[in-house]
């Protein structure tokens, strides 16, 4: 299955122009199997997203994009978000003890909000985006190289704030994702890989990229 793991919805992300229903319509049009809403410092969409999933049969998971002192991290499985800014390690520890996971968002983006080379050494980091929709290609390539050095595959996410951005990059999971726990397990076990949307379908990265599903 294929999920876009990084999307902002306008209710709780003031810089987003897109609502949940139109996000889902676009996601379905592009062939996504599910989406993750990751608003800035908020998981306020959780209840509505759960209801939408039950009513419409389209998986909508909710995490949050949290700015730490070292950079942005997508957290999932953390019901109560911190009320104040934390160091990345403290946020990851908080997620871990609550059964959640942390994914570094756009680690090499040149905006002062990426973890950079810390993705290579930060304990507790489950994955990181190697294909990020709002990140320039050379900086995504740095993330890809870091993943190769670590023997990991990494994630893909659009970081969509506009409708046309939804699904530009996404994450492939070889296993069925039918619950939040399925998603958390797949991320934790590195059973995922980045994909990009091209000519009407999603494609895995080729070349020297390594996959570790089996």
PLM segments and residue spans:
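Charged catalytic cores and adjacent phosphate/nucleic-acid-binding surfaces used
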Residues: 1-9, 13, 19-25, 44-48, ...
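Divalent metal-dependent hydrolysis catalytic cores, especially in the metallo-beta-lactamase
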Residues: 4, 24-41, 101-103
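Aromatic-lined carbohydrate-recognition surfaces of secreted/lumenal glycan-active proteins
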Residues: 103-111
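Short, N-terminal intrinsically disordered low-complexity segments that are rich in Pro/Gly
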Residues: 12-17, 35-39
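Short, conserved beta-strand segments within well-ordered enzyme catalytic domains
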Residues: 36, 59-61
């Amino acid at each position: 299955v294929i999920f876009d793991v990084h999307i902002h919805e306008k209710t709780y992300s003031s810089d987003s122009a897109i609502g949940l229903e139109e996000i889902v319509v676009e996601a379905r049009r592009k062939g996504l199997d599910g989406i993750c809403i990751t608003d800035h410092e908020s998981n306020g969409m959780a209840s509505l997203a759960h209801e939408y999933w039950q009513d419409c049969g389209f998986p909508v998971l909710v995490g949050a994009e949290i700015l730490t002192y070292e950079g942005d991290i997508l957290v999932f499985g953390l019901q109560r978000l911190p009320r104040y800014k934390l160091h990345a390690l403290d946020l990851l520890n908080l997620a871990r003890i609550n059964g959640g996971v942390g994914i570094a968002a756009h680690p090499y983006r040149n905006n002062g909000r990426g973890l950079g080379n810390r993705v290579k050494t930060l304990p507790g980091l489950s994955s990181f985006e190697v294909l990020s929709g709002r990140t320039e290609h050379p900086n995504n390539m740095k993330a890809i190289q870091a993943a190769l050095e670590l023997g990991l595959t990494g994630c893909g996410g659009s970081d969509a704030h506009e409708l046309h951005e939804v699904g530009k990059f996404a994450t492939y999971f070889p296993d069925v994702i039918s619950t939040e726990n399925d998603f958390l397990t797949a991320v934790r076990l590195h059973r995922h890989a980045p994909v990009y949307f091209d000519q009407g379908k999603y494609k895995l990265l080729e070349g020297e990229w390594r996959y570790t599903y089996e």
